[in-house]
């Protein structure tokens, strides 16, 4: 969904995100324009045969915002190409306790 800035121009926000399971043993990186909806899909196993459903990926531990979809896709690919250690370092720099950011942010003006 496009948002409107303070002078009435529509703009879109894109997100690169990392989710994990309860034990933080499996990491999933994705890109979306609707982070709250996408997290809900993962959490409710909307696609039961998907990777995220199979490995119970339901905890949002990291996300970045982008104004340009191409920048978001480039960043997603960069994160996916990195090692597990690099992903963990990225998460721990912003969210050292691996809190579920969805639980903290849902319903707020975080998007």
Set out the residue ranges of the language-model regions.
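Short, surface-exposed polybasic/aromatic micro-patch for ligand or macromolecular engagement
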Residues: 66
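C2H2-type zinc-finger recognition helix
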Residues: 69
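Short arginine-rich
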Residues: 77-91
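GIY-YIG nuclease catalytic motif and its immediate N-terminal context
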Residues: 1-47, 53-63, 74-77, 94-111
């Amino acid at each position: 969904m496009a948002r409107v800035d303070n002078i009435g121009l529509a703009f879109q926000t894109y997100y690169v995100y990392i989710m994990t399971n309860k034990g933080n043993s499996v990491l999933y990186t994705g890109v979306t324009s609707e982070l709250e909806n996408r997290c809900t899909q993962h959490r409710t196993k909307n696609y039961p045969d998907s990777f995220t459903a199979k490995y119970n990926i339901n905890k949002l531990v990291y996300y970045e915002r982008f104004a340009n979809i191409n920048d978001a896709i480039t960043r997603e690919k960069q994160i996916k190409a990195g090692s597990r250690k690099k992903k963990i370092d990225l998460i721990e720099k912003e969210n050292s306790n691996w809190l579920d950011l969805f639980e903290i942010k849902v319903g707020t003006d975080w998007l």
